[in-house]
Amino acid sequence: MKNRKKPIGIIITISIVLLLTIVTLLGWAYYNSKLDLIQYDDGSKEIDTSTSYAIDNDELDIADLPDAPEDVDASGGIEILEGDIYHDDNVVNILLLGTDERTDEFNENARADAIMVMSLNTKEHTIKLISIERGIGVPVPGRNDDWITHTFRYGGAALTMQTVRDCFKLDVERYVRVNFNVVSKAIDKIGGVDIELTQAEAEHLNSAKKNYYESGSDIQTVHAGTNHLNGDTAMAYARIRKIDSDWKRIERQRTVIQAAINQVENSDIFTLNALADAILPMVQTNLTKAEITRLMLEVPAFLSEGSKMEQMTIPTSGTCWNSVGVDGRKMIGVDFEANAQILKTFFYDIS
């Protein structure tokens, strides 16, 4: 009797192992199919040096900044900051670029309408996010000084990464680019986001049809207070700057990101699958599949910590001033040394 049970036990064990293997392989195949949706690109682009390449009518809405310090020539050339770049094996810094094509296709002539750096500490499982003001004046190879947002249009993600490394001495070798048009669709996939609106913001959104940026978009009628926004309205909110400044615009972008994260945390597996199918084809990165997988394996640890993102904007108050760049365009002059030190302290908790 024992001899009869033994083969049955072996068969059951083998069957379970085979079943687990099949499930694992299917799971890996599914996961890999999602990774295949992403556009992998090293971010390089031949630098364009034509003088009319930037968007001529682009404006910079910034709060009143002081004049340049007496020892700074506000109209002079911007010099690259000297010094070493600090590195920590436990910290991964990723440049996040939001490009504003207003179509479902990437355009190499797009500009980076949002520039952020997300810092992931895989030892402490903390997430930190900085927003970089788009109007910061930076040196551009083969050109005069210009806004940091235009570096993407001149030389792609590679040039923007290089500029961030050079100007802020920040260790960033990886980037993720997202088409803003697909962000709107992604927000719709997760059922919208809750955003608190001021009276001025509500009035602006209710008149958004006058704004060519929102032409043809499904902008809701909103009110002051908490609103549940669809994708188009959330993106219109994230773009607002006319009623106050570029600084507040950055805050709004981060507000939308946090609201979307909050919504995703409460989404079921079917919603997450639809979200991945909608957004991943319009994601471009130089992260490898192996690097993405390593970071994905850390996600449970990040979530278990229950930590919110620590956030800040660069440049900080008291470290910037009015400056002038290409063709007399107003720019933000920056004390790069001071901001580099601030970032080092923020990301690595060292002085």
Q: What is each model feature region?
A:
Residues 1-41:
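Gram-positive cell-envelope targeting signals
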Residues 42, 47-84, 90-92, 100, ...:
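C-terminal solvent-exposed extensions
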Residues 85, 182-271:
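Flexible, polar/acidic helix-loop-strand segments at domain edges
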Residues 87-93, 99, 107-111, 141, ...:
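Solvent-exposed, acidic/flexible segments
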Residues 89-92, 110-115, 124-132, 143, ...:
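Extracytoplasmic
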Residues 97, 103, 135, 162-173, ...:
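Structured segments of extracytoplasmic/periplasmic soluble domains
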Residues 102-107, 146-154, 169-174, 224, ...:
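Second-shell loop/turn segments in exported
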Residues 114, 145, 149, 157-165, ...:
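Extracytoplasmic/secreted envelope proteins and their assembly/folding machinery
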